[in-house]
Amino acid sequence: MKKIIPILLVLFLFITTSIVAQNSSVKGFIVSENNNFLSSVNITLSSTNHGIISNEKGEFEFKNLKKGKYVINLSMVGFEKKSITVRLKNNESKNLGRILLKEAIDELDEITINGVKNRYAKKKVSNSLRLQTPIKQLPQNIQVVGSEVLQDQLVTNMLEGAFRNVSGVSNIEHWGNFARVNMRGFRLPAFRNGVNIQDSWGPLSEDTFMIDRIEFVKGPSGFMMAAGEPGGFYNVVTKKPTEEKTGSINLMAGSFDTYRAAADFGGSLTSDKRLLARLNVLYQNAGSHRRFEDSERIGVAPSLSYKISDKTDFLTEFSFQKLNTLLGAAYIFAPLDKGFGSLPKNFSMVDSNFPDTDIKEVSLLNQLTHRFNNNWSVEAKYVTMLYTQQGASAWLNSMQNNGDAIRSVSIWDAISESEYFQLYANGNFNTGAVTHKVMGGFDYTDKEYFADFYQGGAVDTPTNPFNIYNPTYGDRIFPVFDRSTPLKDRTPSYSYGTKINSIYAQDEIGFLENKIRLTLAGRYTQLTPKGDITTKKFTPRIGLSADITPQITAYGLYDQSFLANDAIDNTGNRFDPIEGTIYEAGLKTNWLNGKINASLSAYIINKNNITTSDPTDPTRQFSILLGEVESKGFEFDMQAHITSELDLLLNYANTDVKIAKSNISNAVGTRIAGHAKHITNGWLNYNFNQNSALKGFGISLGYQYLVDRTSWTIGANNKAELPDYFRMDGGVHWKNNKLRIALNINNILNKHLYSGTKNDKFLYWQSEPGINGRISLTYNLF
């Protein structure tokens, strides 16, 4: 007995000491980016067998922990994984507070109950579009092109057809350095990370080495802007830092001596996952199906994000793009009576010694996000961009019927400087059974563009012309450009600038458990062109969205846009601003647990107060009111995961853009240039399943079909003179966990494809390459 008592005493002391040593705890609650509580999140402690899930309020707690260092791992289907490092002392109760899980928009946008993913469908827009509501419930047609389809199609930049994946979008003429994209009959401004960076001849087309996704927003969009064309806009979202370690190297080679290398690295720089980084780099050297049209491209895009606290995040993102190319080399010219496409598709109007152009674009984004609580957050964003260009452009002075041409070269130096600031708040609250998602903020834009294209001259002479039917290259004398004066001080020169100040407020009101959503919003804008008067405009936005069934949502939209009108009549009076108004209705569907996503929309866009030159004014200084342009049509988009092996992307658009009202006789009914009445695109991707002998292999096939195309400008006969356009592309690929090898063939049928227009002196067009291919190898390091 005397021996047992000491043993029991030691055992008692050991047990009580152990209990005291294991009375620490850690807890928190988990929310989504919309500040909704996340239940059923899997939460584990590294190096232990502890595992729990969060409750309906997103809460979790680990109790009876020893002092020491722990790593808390959080995971949930459809969300990015997250790890949090904590250090606990004896008897410490640590509250981590609010923990944010970000949706994995790059990887798990649509997942079925069987874990099958719709690779081409996206549930949400990016945070840069400010909207908290899923795409299916938004009262507007918004389509998202993700990195998955860009990889399948081996697209390398915006000029190569990323727009084919969205209904009704087409690429109009360009100078080889920027994407001239039209939709619903109007030019689309280019946005990048939620900022309108459109310029007079820009921006430099984004390369896919830095692109995460491209969002096409159709029609006026007051939640982003009011000053602009009414067709909509496209928003390029660049790659951002992530907690998960990423690393990949891509090598590509293709027709016309195209060689390309890109790399993508990222992950956490600290053990507590507070400092994240990403680096994307690119080098490309490419030829063309036309002679003497080589180009070189370099890109660097580093970014950092830092978690200042549990409620505050900071993001900084830098990008540098450099392009060397020959501007104007894409154009082909011919006499009026010869017809479009009358010269071979590889024909070149330029010589090897034509002066080339260097373009540099530098941008810096700084973004601060603060979450006050579960329902309210604010975000401030500052972006600055500098675009410089030094070079020349090639054009045509004259064309004779026998093919004798006088070509010209003019200087094209340019500087574009721009600054942007955005401050926006998002919030959620209830008034009884009615929910409210509110958003409001301020936008500031300051852009200036300077250019010199007034120096130049002919490179051919009447006695020594360039004949398009018997071309002789070389032996030409080029004008010498005087760059001794800084560009901004040169005379004559071209300059343009604009300042925009605007405020916006929106309330999305949810009824019947948010099955019906009414959006009431408005934007007040002050737009001041450089050296001109300020245009002030209030534009309302009204949207209605209703869940007819869990699979079908119906919506309607009314919104407005405007453009400053600098035209004056012969009495010196200025015309009213050009106004755009949209009426849109549609259906959005989601079938088979996300396997099939489709949308159908119909719209009418009216663009008022359009002017044209006064025919009675020989000076061409004055204008008269042309009237109203009406764009109407319907559009269909579908992204489908038909089986576990088969993915399909399909779209169709019917677009009709005409003058609807006019004071000018015979103008009503005139077709507006820059669109095709019918556009349909398809892309099919088949991956052999894991049990197949061809495991890892896949094939792709796609088409683009444009019917009843207008030229870039409509002729006096009010007829489109371009033939229908049909192109077929395909590819084959193999992949495993580390490696992906792909071979794509474009224009399989070797069609002579082109688009163009004419003036009163000659035709001009741009051709696409015949059958061509590229092979890509991507190696994943992790």
Map each language-model feature to its residues.
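Outer-membrane beta-barrel translocator/receptor signature
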Residues: 210-212, 223-300, 308-312, 362, ...
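Gram-negative outer-membrane beta-barrel transporters
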Residues: 515, 625-713, 776-780
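Membrane-embedded beta-barrel scaffold of Gram-negative outer-membrane proteins
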Residues: 369-373, 377-383, 388-393, 579-641, ...
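Short, acidic, small-residue-rich periplasmic hinge/interaction motif at the N-terminus
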Residues: 31-33, 41-46, 75-79, 89, ...
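Acidic/polar loop-and-plug regions of large Gram-negative outer-membrane beta-barrel proteins
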Residues: 284, 288, 301-371, 386-416, ...
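Short acidic/polar hinge/loop motifs at secondary-structure boundaries
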Residues: 171, 179-180, 196-218, 236-238
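C-terminal beta-signal and adjacent terminal beta-strands/loops
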Residues: 7, 648, 704-714, 733-782
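Structural signature of Gram-negative outer-membrane beta-barrels, strongest in the C-terminal barrel
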Residues: 309, 416-418, 435-439, 443-447, ...
